[in-house]
Amino acid sequence: MALPWRIRPGGLELRVRVTPRGGRDAIDGVEALADGRPVLKVRVRAAPDKGAANEGVRRLLAEALGLPASAVSLESGAAARLKTFSIAGAAEPLAAALAAMTGHAHP
């Protein structure tokens, strides 16, 4: 399976499928969409109201990667379940951390 992140200058680009009001804040692994695109499945307790769910995802990703919340920013999909986040930092260690937490081999 392809990976939902892509190395880019200054960090990573990460494709995420968000479930707001998911009962808990959690990263649930990688799945392929119907069109084959891989996404990181994330759920947050926050409702999709006034950006609360987006902020919840941003903070969850930062915490999981050991980064300050300011290192994670929403690039696209503010009002959609499918979102793209930009993660600033050393790309290789970030990719390795994502691979470890999702059980996927880092190329």
Predicted features and spans:
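Contiguous, often N-terminal, cationic amphipathic patches that form binding interfaces
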Residues: 1-58, 67-69, 73-79, 84-107
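Residues within the alpha-helical elements of helix-turn-helix
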Residues: 64
